[in-house]
Structures are given as structure tokens and as C-alpha cells.
Amino acid sequence: MAFEDVWKKISWLYYQYILVTALYMLEPWERAIFNSILISVAGMAVYTGYVFMPQHIMAILQYFEMVQ
């Protein structure tokens, strides 16, 4: 029963994603390309944040003399 509820929620969220981004008008192969590009850009943004955020935080803390 819980699995069905989770599946319904995921299906509902996917349906909302399709409607909000207007992907329902695209062919399946076009939708796959769009989703691939979106996942790639999101992955690069997360990776860049993971790599560079600590350096920026340390620079800010040193600027405000909170860390020596």
C-alpha cells in the first residue's frame, strides 16, 4: 500500500513537471534530449558548487577576519 502511494506521488510530480515545462508537446526523443541537457546542466552546477564553494567561503571568512 505504501509503495502505491509513493508511486502515485512520483507520478503526480512527473506529470506536473511535464505540464509546467510544456514537454507534453514534444516527441519522446525530443523530451529525452531536453531532459538529458537539463540533468547535465544541473549536474555541472552541483559539481561546480561542491568544488568552488569552500574556497569562496574561506575567502569571505578571511576577508571579514573571522578566520586567520
Swiss-Prot record:
Cystine residue pairs: none
Cytoplasmic-side segments: 1-9, 55-68
Keywords: Endoplasmic reticulum, Lipid metabolism, Membrane, Sphingolipid metabolism, Transmembrane, Transmembrane helix
Lumenal side of membrane: 27-31
This protein's record includes keyword ATP-binding: no
Pathway this chain belongs to: Lipid metabolism; sphingolipid metabolism
GO cellular component: endoplasmic reticulum membrane; serine palmitoyltransferase complex
GO biological process: ceramide biosynthetic process
Quaternary structure and interacting proteins, as annotated: Component of the serine palmitoyltransferase (SPT) complex, which is composed of SPTLC1, SPTLC2 or SPTLC3 and SPTSSA or SPTSSB. The heterodimer consisting of SPTLC1 and SPTLC2/SPTLC3 forms the catalytic core of the enzyme, while SPTSSA or SPTSSB subunits determine substrate specificity. SPT also interacts with ORMDL proteins, especially ORMDL3, which negatively regulate SPT activity in the presence of ceramides.
Protein name per the record: Serine palmitoyltransferase small subunit A
Organism for this UniProt entry: Salmo salar
